[in-house]
């Protein structure tokens, strides 16, 4: 009886172990950590231009003026570690200075923000090993859609959350709304990663694989936020060593680990489909044997 249970457990864990080996092999072959480092570098260069473009879009729509402030606080509270207040102050100063630029400088900001979109596109298609290239006009349209619709959708989601908060006066809905608001950042991350893994690759991505990969990435991202904030508050070694400049290495490390999580979610999405194909091919060979 015990031997039968052990055999069943071994039989069930064998596919998981094979999938994990395939995942590790792909991470190694794709140089995932190097890709994450490249994206982190480009992201830091594009951070101020990207934020400037996003909030310039909100300024063009007066109805989003209040949502713009909420979105700004939401981003720095949920997508940056515990030093988000300091980083927010610096970035807002940089963005205020960028608003004084000429038309040529503004075009430069937009180009820099689009270069970040291109780098993300290139990295994800490297992971998917897709050789097919999009037409340049179509790529530009996709990047511009992300830059324009992304912030507007985020603003709409914040408007919904504000509406939910306004319903808290109803005692019967208090617990439900609190639970919804508590998992709202996780849901937003999950949807964002799912859209990223579904739209950006130039080959078709199975929807269920993108959902699983995005969910794992969203969970890791939420865990990273809490773990990073805990580390900074409990072990303030960066502040002791760097003083007022501590925000710089903290931001560097945060952005790098965030891109590692994003690319790991992409690797998981790809590996799910590849493992399924390899398993089907092996079963087909067994069926073909006399």
Swiss-Prot record:
A Pfam family this chain is assigned to: Virul_fac_BrkB
Keyword match Transmembrane helix: yes
Localisation: Cell inner membrane
InterPro entries: UPF0761_bac, Virul_fac_BrkB
Transmembrane intervals: 44-64, 104-124, 140-160, 183-203, 210-230, 244-264
Domain of life where this protein originates: Bacteria
Any one annotated GO CC term: plasma membrane
Keyword Membrane attached: yes
Keywords: Cell inner membrane, Cell membrane, Membrane, Transmembrane, Transmembrane helix
Membrane topology recorded in Swiss-Prot or TrEMBL: Multi-pass membrane protein
Similarity remark: Belongs to the UPF0761 family.
NCBIfam families associated with the record: PRK01637.1, yihY_not_rbn
Protein's name according to its UniProt entry: UPF0761 membrane protein YihY
